[in-house]
Amino acid sequence: MKKEILSPMPGTVVDVLISKGDKVMEGQDAVVIDAMKMENRIQVPADGTVADVLVALKDKVAANQVMVVIE
């Protein structure tokens, strides 16, 4: 079953901590977003393998935008 990591708020990607093909665990940090002058660490929702990373460093993201797909 696929799981998506969504941006909880609009902001700018300041770090991408995982790559396509990585094995990840629930709770692991995946992406760091700068929003309202605060860095927000977005975590992996479930164990799995990264199927796709849809954002890159300095990308602007919208609220609820899909950033990563986990299989």
Spans of model-derived segments:
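Short beta-strand-turn/beta-hairpin segments enriched in glycine/proline and small hydrophobics
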Residues: 1-10, 32-45, 70
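C-terminal accessory/binding modules appended to enzymatic or scaffolding proteins
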Residues: 6, 10, 19-26
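Short histidine-centered loop motifs in beta-beta connectors
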Residues: 15-19, 52-55
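A structural signal for short beta-strand/turn segments enriched in small hydrophobics and glycine
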Residues: 21-30, 35, 58-67
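C-terminal structural segments of small proteins and small subunits
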Residues: 43, 52-71
